[in-house]
Regions:
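Asp-box/WD-like beta-propeller blade repeats and closely related beta-sheet repeat scaffolds
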Residues: 1-34
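Short loop/turn segments immediately following beta-strands, especially the blade-tip
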Residues: 1-9, 58-65, 105-116, 161-168, ...
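Surface loop/turn motifs at the tips and blade-to-blade linkers of beta-strand repeat domains
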Residues: 16, 25-29, 72-76, 123, ...
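Beta-rich catalytic cores
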Residues: 31, 79, 135, 154, ...
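Residue-level detector of Asp-centered blade-edge/turn motifs that repeat once per structural unit
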Residues: 39-40, 87-89, 143-144, 190-192, ...
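Short loop/turn segments immediately following the C-termini of beta-strands
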Residues: 49-50, 59, 97-98, 107, ...
Length: 239
């Protein structure tokens, strides 16, 4: 639990994933890479990069336990990495590190158990060069929920998709280089007009102006030096 001032309290419960992955030299054991509550706060989605599954737990506030209710079984050797929900709570977006795709799911939590319906699968790659080891790593959405962005290491690019708010489906706008190595994460500024990308191997943060009309990302200024960055988030500070 957490305290009102944001401090972490004691651990209330814990779960342990078991099983073997399908990529022996890489992902061969459970490896949870993202945990995301559903927008209705009924369930917790644990994205397991190692065993190609998203385990869905019911949050039992009476017993303070997590109860496994369903498993989304992804393609073997796909490497699910990160998951985000639309603000209206109707759609989920999931990126895959190994097969370099993004998927759209419709979510419905109104029944006895959660329902995830796969709607769309799109590539995150600008090219399909078999000699490049690519890994889609970062996922974010614009503040107005109209655009989805993801970053891919290897070819070192960012993909921008326009999101249909009614259907949840994505339309690719561009996939462009980010002038850095291994873009592990990214975030849109609160103004919705700029994008920051953290580049793990080049020890940098690169920033871009987002030109939605012309479907472009325009680099702004020199990269900022940061030692092996992994993640980035914008948070409003108290005045």
């Amino acid at each position: 639990h957490t305290h009102r001032d944001g401090r972490l309290g004691s651990v209330v419960t814990g779960v342990f994933h078991k099983g073997l992955g399908s990529v022996g030299e890489r992902n061969f054991r459970p490896h949870v890479s993202c945990v995301r509550p559903t927008p209705d706060n009924k369930y917790l989605c644990a994205v397991d990069n190692g065993i190609d599954q998203i385990k869905i737990y019911r949050v039992n506030r009476r017993t303070k336990r997590l109860e496994l209710v369903d498993i989304l079984r992804c393609h073997r050797e796909s490497g699910p990495k990160k998951m985000k929900f639309s603000k209206d709570g109707k759609f989920a977006y999931l990126i895959y590190e190994l097969n370099n795709t993004i998927q759209v799911y419709r979510y419905d939590g109104s029944g006895k158990n959660p329902v995830f319906e796969l709607l769309q699968t799109e590539s995150t790659l600008a090219s399909h060069d078999d000699e490049t080891h690519d890994a889609t790593s970062g996922l974010c959405m614009s503040p107005d929920d109209k655009y989805v962005f993801c970053s891919t290491a290897g070819e070192d690019t960012v993909a921008m998709y326009k999101r249909d708010e009614q259907t949840g489906l994505l339309e690719k706008q561009c996939i462009l280089p980010i002038s850095g190595n291994y873009p592990k994460d990214l975030a849109v500024f609160p103004d919705g007009k700029h994008l920051a990308v953290v580049n793990h191997e080049s020890n940098s943060i690169t920033t871009f102006a987002i030109d939605y009309e012309n479907k472009l990302l325009i680099m702004k200024g020199k990269p900022m030096k940061v030692e092996t960055p992994n993640s980035i988030i914008f948070s409003k500070c108290q005045e």
